[in-house]
Amino acid sequence: MKYLNLWIVAISTIMISLTSCAPKPTKIVPPEFKAGQSQYHRVCANCHGADALGKNTKAPGLIDPEYLLENFSDDEIYQQVIEGSDKMPSQRNKISDSEITEVIKYLRYSQKAADLLTEEDEIDESDE
């Protein structure tokens, strides 16, 4: 019995430590993007950073012009998550199709919130 209590305390401590390791969201998003933000932090943030900026992480930031829609489509993001690549392991067993869709919506919202402009947007603004 004494050892059982010790095991329970040890396992509880480990579980608390593990749950506190994942990066936490640092920005408040509208309700329609909360599910995507939550899934992003569960599956993606350990590599791509809590704010998807990639700072001090092993993976690139996703809030970057390279990942805007005209450079990297939603379908390409989906395929990258499911299939992986030489730089990124597949996340197929960690996230469902509908959760990937929510993550993509959250990323697109975050790109817009970061005021990333497409080349077309920059040209249109300079014409005014």
Q: Predicted segment positions?
A:
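Hydrophobic helical h-region of N-terminal Sec-dependent signal peptides
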Residues: 9-15
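C-terminal motif of bacterial Sec signal peptides marking the signal peptidase cleavage site
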Residues: 17-20
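A general structural signal marking secondary-structure boundaries and capping sites
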Residues: 51, 66, 85, 110-114
